[in-house]
């Protein structure tokens, strides 16, 4: 039985899917105007683990995460780079897949894009206007916030509280300062689409509502994203979706905590803005993922090199213990005794499932993995080892690895295929021919680190595995 903290009710609740055995999940994705930063990586990793655990428990998960490819940030970037908005979006969507792929995030069931759903967005807005929940004003379309009775229920704010900070910007023709934009009138030189309200483009909030509705239906099981999206983005999504769909938008709302850099909020103005594209050149992506899951998803994370170093050491400890289990297999026997070890392994697995059932507590799940490694290190020192026990160790290691998404072997230690080695030898030969001896030495040293020895023969360079 899985329980999760529901932001909507501010308490942990037992998860009950709309459809037995199936989880419909929508996670707010990035605005693709740049490479993603580590703040974007956190929800990608956290909710990937949530998905993996549901799948481990036997659920079919329909996991939808969008790309915002029409936005003020993209338009500004377009002017800055003198490239079209679609060109910029394509570039950074490709980069997103590369970055989250390096972090071992599973591909979503679907990654809808705003530009691909423009017709549905326009129809959705028109239906809200027809029902009196929205109104057109000088080419813009606004949502009547006070028309929706439940506004503020996610962020637990009243309309009176919100009225204090609300204001009407220059050029806006709102009926009420609390109303928000569904459709923006086109400005000269900006990307735009034809609509019954005139040329323009959608507001940010309506985009997610429509894509979630198109992909998952009127009501979804789980809607997730960063804490910063809770208000106004998710609050506005609820209002426009429930006004349109006449049904609850999402039964459970999950929000992950922020990432601070050396105890300071990450921001461009402070110069501590860290892109995943850059950091994975210096930090093993597996270590970065392990670091992220070592903290509960709702808690804030403080990122610094010392803490990342601790995560690296912890992951090495787990991997080294697994390697010892594999090595001990070579001299194991078919012993029937030592059942107490099987019991201890299963107890740790039960501990892992218990903490993951409790709001996906990956921090305590990592502790269970450390306990398994400690038990494995103790077991390999026994005079005799059982094949059955070693296999059970490996099975549970694999469960932890699959659920948490952290490979048991680093990419550096994975065995190269013969054709990969031949390709590297060919690249080294080319480098030597071009007198790029630094690159030639780099390839030689990399192969040596993987216990592959190069030998010069009359027939050319050959290799052997050490």
Swiss-Prot record:
It is an enzyme of class 6 (ligase). ATP binds at residue 268. GO terms for biological process: cysteinyl-tRNA aminoacylation. Its cofactor is Zn(2+). InterPro entries: Cys-tRNA-ligase, Cys-tRNA-synt_Ia_DALR, Cys-tRNA/MSH_ligase, CysS_C, Rossmann-like_a/b/a_fold, tRNA-synt_1_cat_dom, tRNAsynth_Ia_anticodon-bd. Keywords: Aminoacyl-tRNA synthetase, ATP-binding, Cytoplasm, Ligase, Metal-binding, Nucleotide-binding, Protein biosynthesis, Zinc. A motif ('KMSKS' region) lies at residues 265-269. A motif ('HIGH' region) lies at residues 30-40. It is found in: Cytoplasm. GO terms for cellular component: cytosol. One of its GO terms (molecular function) is zinc ion binding. The keyword Protein biosynthesis applies. Binds 1 zinc ion per subunit. Zn(2+) binds at residues 28, 208, 233, 237. Its EC number is 6.1.1.16. It catalyses: tRNA(Cys) + L-cysteine + ATP = L-cysteinyl-tRNA(Cys) + AMP + diphosphate. Monomer. Belongs to the class-I aminoacyl-tRNA synthetase family. This is Cysteine--tRNA ligase. The lineage of its organism: Bacteria, Bacillati, Bacillota, Bacilli, Bacillales.
């Amino acid at each position: 039985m899985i329980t999760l903290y529901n932001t909507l009710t501010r308490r942990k609740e037992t998860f009950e899917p709309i459809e037995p055995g199936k989880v419909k999940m929508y996670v707010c994705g990035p605005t693709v105007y740049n490479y993603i930063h580590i703040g974007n990586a956190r929800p990608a990793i956290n909710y990937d683990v949530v998905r993996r655990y549901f799948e481990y428990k036997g659920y079919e998960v329909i996991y939808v995460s969008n790309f915002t490819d029409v936005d003020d940030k993209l338009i500004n970037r377009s002017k800055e780079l003198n490239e079209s908005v679609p060109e910029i979006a394509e570039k950074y969507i490709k980069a997103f897949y590369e970055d989250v792929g390096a972090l071992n995030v599973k591909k979503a069931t679907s990654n809808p894009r705003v530009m691909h759903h423009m017709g549905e967005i326009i129809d959705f807005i028109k239906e809200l206007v027809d029902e009196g929940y929205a109104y057109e004003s000088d080419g813009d379309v606004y949502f009547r916030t006070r028309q929706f009775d439940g506004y503020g229920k996610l962020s637990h704010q009243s309309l009176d509280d919100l009225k204090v900070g609300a204001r009407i910007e220059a050029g806006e023709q709102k009926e009420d300062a609390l109303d928000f934009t569904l459709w923006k009138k086109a400005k000269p030189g900006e990307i735009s689409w034809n609509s019954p309200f005139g040329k323009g483009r959608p507001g940010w909030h309506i985009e997610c509502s429509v894509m979630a509705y198109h992909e998952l239906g009127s009501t979804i099981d789980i809607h997730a994203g960063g804490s910063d999206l809770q208000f106004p983005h998710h609050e506005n999504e609820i209002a426009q979706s429930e006004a349109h769909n006449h049904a609850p938008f999402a039964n459970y709302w999950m929000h992950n905590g922020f990432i601070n850099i050396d105890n300071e909020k990450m921001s461009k103005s402070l110069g501590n803005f860290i892109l995943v594209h850059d950091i994975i050149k210096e930090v093993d992506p597996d270590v970065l993922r392990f670091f992220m899951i070592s903290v509960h998803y709702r808690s804030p994370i403080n990122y610094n090199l010392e803490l990342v170093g601790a995560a690296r050491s912890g992951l090495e400890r787990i991997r080294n213990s697994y390697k010892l289990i594999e090595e001990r297999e070579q001299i194991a026997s078919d012993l029937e005794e030592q059942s107490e070890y099987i019991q201890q392994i299963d107890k740790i697995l039960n501990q892992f499932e218990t903490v993951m059932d409790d709001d996906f507590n990956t921090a305590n799940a990592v502790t269970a993995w450390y306990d398994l490694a400690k038990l494995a290190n103790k077991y390999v020192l026994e005079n005799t080892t059982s094949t059955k026990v070693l296999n059970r160790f490996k099975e549970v290691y694999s469960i932890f690895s699959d659920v948490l998404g952290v490979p048991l072997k680093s990419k550096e230690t994975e065995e190269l295929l013969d054709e990969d080695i031949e390709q590297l030898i060919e690249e080294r030969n080319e480098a030597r021919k071009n007198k790029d001896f630094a690159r030639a030495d780099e390839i030689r040293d990399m192969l040596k680190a993987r216990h592959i020895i190069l030998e010069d023969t009359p027939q050319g360079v050959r290799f052997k595995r050490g």
